[in-house]
Swiss-Prot record:
EC number(s) reported in the record: 7.1.1.2
Keyword tags: Electron transport, Membrane, Mitochondrion, Mitochondrion inner membrane, NAD, Respiratory chain, Translocase, Transmembrane, Transmembrane helix, Transport, Ubiquinone
Gene for this chain: MT-ND4L
The protein's name: NADH-ubiquinone oxidoreductase chain 4L
Molecular-function GO term, any one: NADH dehydrogenase (ubiquinone) activity
Chief site of localization: mitochondrion
PANTHER family: NADH-UBIQUINONE OXIDOREDUCTASE CHAIN 4L (PTHR11434:SF0), NADH-UBIQUINONE OXIDOREDUCTASE SUBUNIT ND4L (PTHR11434)
Organism (species): Muntiacus gongshanensis (Gongshan muntjac)
Subunit relationships: Core subunit of respiratory chain NADH dehydrogenase (Complex I) which is composed of 45 different subunits.
GO BP terms: ATP synthesis coupled electron transport
């Protein structure tokens, strides 16, 4: 395994650890999710470029589309929660409440 792949996997693990440790604020959770998606995008792109597998060349672009949709939904949820409650705490998100 090359050093580049190990660095990308380390970036993914650090983002995952940040998501698990700093989950009190919604903004920090969204930033960790974006870091995970970025490392997955770079890993998928490098893997496809190194293996010359041209049939899967659309997969990183599709992953980028999903990451953009996730970011838009996360930011709209952040705006809604901060306007409603005044803070961006994750504990304010109660899905059982009507």
């Amino acid at each position: 395994m090359s050093l580049v792949y190990m660095n990308i996997m380390t970036a993914f693990m650090v983002s995952l650890a940040g998501l698990l440790m700093y989950r009190s604020h919604l903004m920090s959770s969204l930033l960790c999710l974006e870091g995970m998606m970025l490392s997955l995008f770079v890993l998928a792109t490098l893997t496809i470029l190194n293996s010359h597998f041209t049939l899967a060349s659309m997969m990183p672009i599709i992953l980028l589309v999903f990451a953009a949709c996730e970011a838009a939904l996360g930011l709209s949820l952040l705006v809604m929660v901060s306007n409603t409650y005044g803070t961006d705490y994750v504990q304010n998100l109660n899905l059982l409440q009507c």
